[in-house]
Amino acid sequence: MGRTNAMVSDIGSGIPYSESVFKAVLASGVNFIETAETYDNGRNEILIGNSINKSERERLFITTKVNLSTGLATSTDDIVRSAEGSLKRLNTPYVDLYMMHQAQSVMKVADKNFHKACDRLKKERKIKFRGLSCHGTFWWQEQGGSIEDILMAAIEDGRYDVLFFPYNFLDPEMGERVIQACKSNDIGTMIMKSNPVSVFENYEKIINQGGNLSILEKKDYERKRLQMDKAGNFFRKYGMTDMTELKKGAYLYILSNKDVSTICCRFKNFSDIEMYIGLSGTTLDNPTASLLSDFRESLGFLNCRIGCNICEQNCPGHLPVNTILRYYYYSQALKENESSSALYRGLGDHKADICTNCQGHCEKKCPHNVAIRLLLTDAHRQFSKTT
């Protein structure tokens, strides 16, 4: 894990969902644990704290995060108290890595209160290292550069030991540039959002929407018809009825990059343990590489490249496109519709209902030809069912 010199499992534990599954994950050999104070309002940290035996603490690498955008941690003392609250919930005297959660601008990278708090916490031996995570900018709130700008600024800052960011086979170039810069500066890397959304279900849902579409949506759908036909050919070619093989391939793609420290996987059940742990130490083979390439060519238009933000900068309605499609990713790829809907409600008036009658300024600027309006309107339709 970069300059930390820690030896971490290539498959790490993202948000755990139950003590029994999490204990089985640890028993399988995983020693990297990722959480945050905001995950399930701190209950996720409590779950971890209740699951870990004190005798195994030294072999584990635990990271948690503080969110500076909630308004609850606005001073050095606030951040120190947040860290101490995390330690209490995690039932540990220290965490190996304390991170700034969701850095939203280049300016945030140098946040004085965060760094002062980390210096104090390190001196008190309550944290060992500091890090930063980034999903992309909140361009609609603060024009703070791209996700790559933020990550590169963190590398240049020199105080961050580990970075946590999206990297996947759909749009690897940015991630690989950041990974190489991290390697050159001896910074560890944690990877998130490595697998695509469940496009098979999306594909069937969109195909069957028919008369439920508005006039503009129907026109947009007709423009996508050739792409949808190509998507159908992909599923028929591989006889695919679910995303299992694609998920495996997506993780193998990351594991094949030996400059990546760990991938954070969400183990929801014992079947996930069997699948993800079985991938540890393996790399991508040619047939699977071809599968991923065909998927990118045939179905890349149904997958937003989270963090790109180019489209958001061109939205006349100042819609948080990247954020909405990140919530959509949580719902589609991680099957977390209830929590994703709650996050969507938290956006207030910044909802994707305005996209129904828009001319598609976002899509015209998207370098990946993503069906942004189609995804946004589907996200709004889906999340509004539970609002």
Regions found by a protein language model. Name each.
Residues 40-41, 138, 169-172, 196-200:
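Short gly/pro/ser/thr-enriched loop/turn and capping motifs at secondary-structure boundaries
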Residues 15, 37-40, 99-102, 134, ...:
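Residues that line or immediately flank small-molecule/substrate-binding pockets and catalytic motifs
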